[in-house]
Amino acid sequence: MKHVRFNIFRKAAFAGALLPYNIYINGEFVGTIKNGKTLNVDVPEADIYYLEDNSSFERNAVIINSNTIDYNILIKRAGGWRTDSYNEFYIDNDDTSDQLPSFHFDRFVNAVFNDSIDQLSPDEQVLALCLNFSYSIMDDIQEVLASSNLSYTIEALKTIGANRYVDLLTQVIDEYFHNVSLPLNDEQIEQMYDGINKANQLIWKNEGPAYDELHKAIVRHITEKLNNPNNIY
């Protein structure tokens, strides 16, 4: 398998100086960068490279394969002072640095909150449901079990190959909610506090490997199914 080299330099900055960046390329953790340092890493060649400074789907950059063996990436801290600071990704081309495009999640997040998922294409619906699940499951499983999209979410997780969470949800439903009509309503949530608490404990106990698999699966879905100018700019 052919590999390419990524040389990723984190420009020194005061904002967030003490926080290391966990770098992911195409969903795989490749290393950590401290303030003012460089990470050199070889990754398998791909048509698209999706870069992140964490695994929470907040900031990213996208590189289309340009048939080169070296990619020199610069991470700059932007914002801060009176606004939240965040990272921007640049690619060095000889004497210039060009900001990289990124995959934009706003349209998919808005579709969930505006209850308009059905207006998205099938592949977009899968992303919206899985993205919403990734946020909800980190807080409390009752958000997942009370969602009107519960059955669609499970199917979406199956579609992208997030099988650990599919198995965990199946186990939770079978063990704690097998005689309950889902999704849960407010009254059921109050009555089933113990079951919800036990379900949360089970999810949290297994969330490391399950979330890693989910993260990789979502990134793979993005790079394979949604890599078009409507989403990347």
Language-model-derived ranges and their functions:
Residues N60-I63, D95-Y152, A156-Y233:
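Extended, alpha-helix-rich binding/interface surfaces that flank or overlap catalytic cores
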Residues M1-L100:
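Short loop/turn and low-complexity linker motifs enriched in small/turn-promoting residues
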